[in-house]
Swiss-Prot record:
Family to which this protein belongs: Belongs to the POMC family.
GO MF term (any one): hormone activity
Lineage, opening ranks: Eukaryota, Metazoa, Chordata, Craniata, Vertebrata
Name of the protein: Pro-opiomelanocortin
Post-translational modification: Specific enzymatic cleavages at paired basic residues yield the different active peptides.
Length: 142
């Protein structure tokens, strides 16, 4: 009776999806630490001392698992430094570029909320107002 109860629970918990169960796993964000390497000395030493320690580390004495972790920590440290340099370069490029639209900036008619409005729908309203004004003027004239 245990698997049946689990299936019942699953179908209940998936009812908030529109077409049944979700496809694939939920993506979890990758944790990015600002200080780069993840070891015990991360809090104790500033960035310059960590670089010196990484250079003086005797890799053959660590063993196969320790060497792999040491290389991964070095790669993470380098990746963090390269990413920071790229961000600094991008900030100095100049004016803001609209890169979040697929083919550059949107058209002038679409810029300020123009996605939802259409100009054709306003013409009947204008004619209605014109007719009301004309009728009102005729009534006052008589």
């Amino acid at each position: 009776s245990e698997p049946g109860r689990r299936e019942g629970k699953r179908s209940y918990s998936m009812e908030h999806f529109r077409w049944g169960k979700p496809v694939g796993k939920k993506r979890r964000p990758v944790k990015v630490y600002p200080n780069g390497a993840e070891d015990e000395s991360a809090e104790a030493f500033p960035l310059e001392f960590k670089r010196e320690l990484a250079g003086e580390r005797p890799e053959p004495a660590l063993g196969p698992e320790g060497a792999a972790e040491g290389m991964a920590a070095l790669a993470d440290l380098e990746y963090g430094l390269v990413a920071k340099a790229e961000v600094a370069e991008k900030k100095d490029d100049g004016p803001y570029k609209m890169e979040h639209f697929r083919w550059g900036s949107p058209g002038k008619d679409k810029r300020y909320g123009g996605f939802m409005t259409s100009e054709k729908s306003q013409t009947p309203l204008v004619t209605l107002f014109k007719n009301a004004i004309i009728k009102n003027a005729h009534k006052k004239g008589q």
